[in-house]
């Protein structure tokens, strides 16, 4: 938040319990510019693997928790950097309180990760479908719950697979509150489609000055997510590293293989 740089996040596609594969993927992503990495914690074996993973990586590790709050408690005991909980499936107040207590004790931030595909039933009944207002209401309900127990080390995400909904939710939230925001369009699909949705959604918010961390969600290798995130930040004027390639779209006046040349240059400079 504040004057800090917008950070790039991705998520491992490996089973977290496979420590070697997960560590290898995290370090590969970190080498090309990933600054925060999230892993799925589906069961106790995933939670138990966290300590070994943390000891072999150099960037913060976030535990993605759904349904079973006890996995958040186990992750917190094993050196996790942040815990993401989903308000739509984490359970009742007593379970949230248990997560808050351990995170407060160990100084672990919590991300309230609202998702349009898993909103609480009462919000769906109230709004009819996952509207921007429904996403924001869910976020504030859980912010108030965490604040009730004196917990403020929180960031929020309100993701939707519909770009206008995600953008409207982030703008509405920011107009009412200044908690840090993690932004991204979820379930965007294959690379070409996903890049367009993410550039529109994330890019428009970044140009508004909204967003503290970003993730480009693609049905592809997470490496492509990191490259895309870097390009979005550069296009928004928020990342100065690397090279901005300026090239003609070509027309009948072109006398060289410009497309081939540009592709060679792009490949050579991709990791800059």
Features from the language model and the residues they span:
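N-terminal amphipathic alpha-helix/helix-capping segment at the start of soluble metabolic enzymes
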Residues: 1-11, 104, 261, 267
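Active-site mouth loops of central-metabolism enzymes
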Residues: 2-21, 40-42, 59-67, 88, ...
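Structural preference for beta-strand elements that scaffold enzyme active sites
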Residues: 5-9, 36-38, 58-64, 81-84, ...
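Glycine-rich, proline-tolerant flexible connector loops at the mouths of alpha/beta enzymes
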Residues: 13-19, 30-57, 84-92, 153-163
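Glycine-rich phosphate-binding active-site loops on the catalytic face of alpha/beta enzymes
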Residues: 33-35, 78-93, 185, 208-222
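Alpha-helix-loop-beta-strand connector modules within alpha/beta enzyme cores
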Residues: 44-65, 98-110, 172-181, 265-270
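Hydrophobic or amphipathic alpha-helical targeting/insertion segments
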Residues: 70-111
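Catalytic alpha/beta core domains of metabolic enzymes, predominantly
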Residues: 115, 123-272
């Amino acid at each position: 938040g504040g004057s800090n740089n917008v950070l790039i996040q991705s998520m491992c596609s490996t089973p977290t319990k496979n420590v070697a594969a997960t560590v290898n993927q995290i370090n590969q992503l970190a080498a090309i510019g990933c600054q925060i990495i999230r892993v799925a914690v589906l069961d106790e074996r995933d939670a138990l693997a966290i300590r070994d993973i943390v000891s072999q990586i150099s960037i913060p590790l976030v535990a993605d928790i759904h349904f079973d709050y006890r996995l958040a408690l186990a992750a917190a005991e094993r050196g996790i950097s942040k815990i993401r909980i989903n308000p739509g499936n984490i359970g009742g107040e007593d379970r949230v309180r248990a997560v808050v207590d351990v995170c407060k004790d160990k100084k672990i931030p919590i991300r309230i990760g609202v998702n349009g595909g898993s909103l609480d039933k009462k919000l769906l009944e109230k709004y009819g479908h996952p509207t921007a207002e429904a996403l924001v209401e869910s976020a504030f309900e859980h912010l108030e719950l965490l604040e009730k127990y004196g917990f403020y080390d929180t960031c929020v995400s309100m993701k939707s697979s519909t770009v206008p909904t995600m953008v409207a939710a982030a703008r509405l939230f920011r107009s009412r509150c200044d908690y840090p925001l993690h932004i991204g369009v979820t379930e965007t699909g294959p690379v070409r489609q996903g890049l367009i949705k993410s550039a529109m959604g994330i890019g428009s918010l970044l140009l508004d000055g909204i967003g503290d961390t970003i993730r480009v969600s693609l049905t592809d290798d997470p490496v492509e997510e990191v490259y895309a995130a870097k390009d979005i930040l550069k296009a928004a004027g928020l990342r100065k590293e690397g090279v901005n390639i300026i090239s003609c779209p070509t027309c009948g006046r072109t006398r060289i293989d410009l497309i081939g040349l540009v592709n060679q240059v792009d490949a050579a400079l991709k990791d800059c």
